[in-house]
Structures are given as structure tokens and as C-alpha cells.
């Protein structure tokens, strides 16, 4: 096995859109409105339209005078994301959206309807620089970071689609957000944290989704995990571990060459200690690569030692990607792996995978037009 791409932590600075309302916190919104010569109360009025009514077109904000709509449209609502296409499966209850940003950059998000929740998987970067060889996004390389507004607007658009009954299953409410789409969220740290705050703040400052229903994933950027722990947020941390030993992880997750397993688990323990939140560990099970019984035993033992009862393992059957030489482990092997991890005192379940047939499942997002 070889790594075909280098790790990229510093994204190209090209293509970022102009300032948008969703890039700004409450104080910055008021300052931006004042710069336009408008009274400060307009800032909350505009924010209530965007976050509360899920309206992104100033021309439709009819409680504002027409001249104000034109003014704020030019200053605070640059073109962000246009739908290229929707693709659905699961009787329409799983819907992947391909977006085109203002500079032509392509990205994807996936909306999944369940009996008890509606979950949106969002992208934080266009592409990914972490170069994991079993992931289509990682093998495509990194185009650029997404702006805070580009991240937030994926959520606003999905919430509006659910509210309006545009997704199979009738009108509904968006309840859960997972930063598990394209990109390494903690490599776009500042914008992702700002987006989390906008997504979770109550209107008029945000979309009002509970922090406890937000998951931020990472391949293991240990210093950023510790930094996130100190942000005062209550989001769930998901660590994409994929193997408990450094020898294999150096290849499967190349960032392990910088922050090995022990360092990642130390950071995860700090996150659990600081936030009081249980950590999720993601494990893509690959036939004859990381599915051996001894690896299950090692995984359970290391996680129990590092995190005790504050960890849960999600086993993910490997999703196929174009040209991949790997495939998912057989079901008996998967069941034995889960059993052995549980035997070590660590809760372990197989994650319900949605969207495989439309290339919308974990590791499949490639933003192909």
C-alpha cells in the first residue's frame, strides 16, 4: 500500500467568497449594518430573516424597505452556493446535493431522514488534504477551505427544504448536523468553529440546532482537538481512527505520521475530560487490512484505557470508491470484530450506512458533476 498524495494542511487561499451575513457574529453584523448607514436594529431584522425564516434572498425579505433590500443584497449577500443537482435514494429519504460555489468550486452535502431525526452531513472543505487512500475525497486532493457562510448555508438550505416538504416524507425539522462530508474540519478550524456557533445559536443569531446534536469529525489533528475542547462547546467529537496500531495507521491515515495513535487518544481524553462529552471513534472495516481479531482486541483495550466509559465505536463497512483495491469485510468477520471490542468493555456497533448507491456514503463524496 502506498500513499499517492502528500498531506496538505494549508489550503490555497483562492476562491473564497466575499463577506456574507453568515460570516459575521452579532457584533460584526451590527457594525456592518452601521457601515451602510442603516440603524442597528436592521441587523437583527436581517438575521431573523436568514436564520429564523431561512430566507437567503434579500429581495424576498419584504419586511425591509426595497432600497434597504438592494443595499444589503449588494453588501451582505454575495452569491454563495447554487444547486447543480440533487440525487436521491432510499425512497427519496436520502438526498445528496451537489453545490457549485461562486468561483466554480464543487462540494456536496447529504440529507438523511430517519424515523426519529433528520441529519445533514456537511462539507467543511472542497476536497481534502489528508490523503487517506481508501477515501474518494482524500484521493481527490484539496481545492480550498469553505468559508463560514458556505458551511452554514448548506445547513440553512437543508432546513428550508425540510420545512417546505421538498424532501420525501413530508415537512420536517432539521435536527442533527455531522461534519463528515468533504474535508478535514479541524484543518479549517476557525471557520468551522464559527459555523458551529452560527448553526447552534438561537435566532436571530443562528439556526438553533442543539450543540449536542452536532458532530465534528477529525482524522486526528491532536493540537486542534485540544483547542476545540477549550472552546466551551458541547459538540460530539468523532475521531476517525480506523486502526489501533501506528504501523498500519501511518498508511491508512497518513496524518498519523505526525500525531500517532497515543497522542490522538490523549487529546481525545482531554476532550472528554474538559467537555464531559463521550467521544465517538469511527472505524472503517476493510477486508484483510484492519479487521483481524487481534486488532479488535487492541482497539478495545487502548480505548478502554484512554477513555473508560466515555467512548463509543462506530464500525463502518467500507464503502466502495472508483478504482479502489479494497472492499468491506465479510459480515461474519464484522460481527466478530464488534463482539471482541464490546468484550473489552467498549460499546461498539455497526453504523447504519446510507446512500452507497448514489455515492453519498462515508468516504464516497467526490463532487463529480
UniProtKB/Swiss-Prot annotation:
Binding site for [4Fe-4S] cluster: 128, 132, 135
Cofactor mode of binding and number, as noted: Binds 1 [4Fe-4S] cluster. The cluster is coordinated with 3 cysteines and an exchangeable S-adenosyl-L-methionine.
Main location: cytoplasm
Keyword Glycosyltransferase among record annotations: no
Residues at which S-adenosyl-L-methionine binds: 183-184, 217, 240-242, 319
Cofactor(s) this protein cannot do without: [4Fe-4S] cluster
Cysteine disulfide links: 121-362
GO CC term, one of those recorded: cytoplasm
Matching InterPro entries: Aldolase_TIM, Methyltransferase_A, RNA_MTrfase_RlmN, rRNA_lsu_MTrfase_RlmN/Cfr, rSAM
CDD domains tied to this protein: Radical_SAM
MF terms (GO), sorted A to Z: 4 iron, 4 sulfur cluster binding; metal ion binding; rRNA (adenine(2503)-C2-)-methyltransferase activity; rRNA binding; tRNA (adenine(37)-C2)-methyltransferase activity; tRNA binding
Top-level EC class: transferase
Catalytic activity line of the entry: adenosine(2503) in 23S rRNA + 2 reduced [2Fe-2S]-[ferredoxin] + 2 S-adenosyl-L-methionine = 2-methyladenosine(2503) in 23S rRNA + 5'-deoxyadenosine + L-methionine + 2 oxidized [2Fe-2S]-[ferredoxin] + S-adenosyl-L-homocysteine; adenosine(37) in tRNA + 2 reduced [2Fe-2S]-[ferredoxin] + 2 S-adenosyl-L-methionine = 2-methyladenosine(37) in tRNA + 5'-deoxyadenosine + L-methionine + 2 oxidized [2Fe-2S]-[ferredoxin] + S-adenosyl-L-homocysteine
Entry's EC annotation: 2.1.1.192
GO biological process: rRNA base methylation; tRNA methylation
Residue ranges of domain Radical SAM core in the record: 114-357
Keyword Cell wall biogenesis/degradation: no
Catalytic residues (UniProt): 108, 362
Subcellular location per the Swiss-Prot or TrEMBL entry: Cytoplasm
Keywords recorded for this protein, A-Z: 4Fe-4S, Cytoplasm, Disulfide bond, Iron, Iron-sulfur, Metal-binding, Methyltransferase, rRNA processing, S-adenosyl-L-methionine, Transferase, tRNA processing
UniProt family annotation: Belongs to the radical SAM superfamily. RlmN family.
PANTHER family reported for this sequence: 23S RRNA METHYLTRANSFERASE, RADICAL SAM CORE DOMAIN-CONTAINING PROTEIN
Stated role: Specifically methylates position 2 of adenine 2503 in 23S rRNA and position 2 of adenine 37 in tRNAs.
Additional observations: Reaction proceeds by a ping-pong mechanism involving intermediate methylation of a conserved cysteine residue.
Protein name: Probable dual-specificity RNA methyltransferase RlmN
Amino acid at each position: 500500500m502506498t500513499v499517492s498524495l502528500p498531506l496538505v494542511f494549508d489550503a490555497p487561499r483562492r476562491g473564497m467568497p466575499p463577506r456574507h451575513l453568515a460570516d459575521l457574529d452579532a457584533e460584526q453584523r451590527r457594525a456592518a449594518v452601521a457601515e451602510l448607514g442603516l440603524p442597528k436594529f436592521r441587523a437583527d431584522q436581517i438575521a431573523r430573516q436568514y436564520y429564523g425564516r431561512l430566507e437567503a434572498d434579500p429581495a424576498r425579505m419584504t419586511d425591509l424597505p426595497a432600497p434597504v433590500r438592494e443595499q444589503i443584497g449588494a453588501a451582505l449577500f454575495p452569491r454563495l452556493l447554487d444547486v447543480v443537482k440533487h440525487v436521491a435514494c432510499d425512497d427519496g429519504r436520502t438526498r445528496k446535493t451537489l453545490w457549485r460555489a461562486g468561483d466554480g468550486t464543487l462540494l456536496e452535502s447529504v440529507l438523511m431522514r430517519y424515523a426519529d431525526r433528520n441529519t445533514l452531513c456537511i462539507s467543511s472543505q472542497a476536497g481534502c488534504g489528508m490523503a487517506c487512500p481508501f477515501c474518494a475525497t482524500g484521493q481527490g486532493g484539496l481545492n480550498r477551505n469553505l468559508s463560514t457562510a458556505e458551511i452554514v448555508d448548506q445547513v440553512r438550505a437543508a432546513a428550508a427544504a425540510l420545512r417546505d416538504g421538498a424532501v420525501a416524507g413530508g415537512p420536517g425539522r432539521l435536527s442533527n448536523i455531522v461534519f463528515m462530508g468533504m474535508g478535514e474540519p479541524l484543518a479549517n478550524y476557525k471557520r468551522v468553529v464559527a459555523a458551529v456557533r452560527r448553526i447552534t445559536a438561537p435566532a436571530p443569531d443562528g439556526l438553533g440546532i442543539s450543540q449536542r446534536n452536532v458532530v465534528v469529525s477529525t482524522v486526528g489533528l491532536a493540537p486542534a482537538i485540544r483547542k476545540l475542547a477549550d472552546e466551551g462547546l458541547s459538540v460530539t467529537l468523532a475521531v476517525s481512527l480506523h486502526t489501533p496500531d501506528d504501523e498500519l495507521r501511518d498508511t491508512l491515515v497518513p496524518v498519523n505520521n505526525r500525531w500517532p495513535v497515543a497522542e490522538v487518544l490523549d487529546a481525545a481524553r482531554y476532550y472528554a475530560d474538559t467537555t464531559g462529552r463521550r467521544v465517538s471513534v469511527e472505524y472503517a472495516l476493510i477486508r484483510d487490512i484492519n479487521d483481524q481479531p487481534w486488532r479488535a482486541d487492541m482497539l478495545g483495550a487502548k480505548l478502554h484505557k484512554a477513555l473508560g466509559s466515555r467512548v463509543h465505536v462506530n464500525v463502518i463497512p467500507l464503502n466502495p470508491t472508483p478504482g479502489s483495491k479494497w472492499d468491506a469485510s465479510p459480515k461474519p468477520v464484522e460481527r466478530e470484530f464488534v463482539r471482541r471490542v464490546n468484550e473489552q468493555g467498549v460499546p461498539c456497533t455497526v453504523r447504519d450506512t446510507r446512500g452507497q448507491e448514489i455515492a453519498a456514503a462515508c468516504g464516497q463524496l467526490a463532487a463529480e458533476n
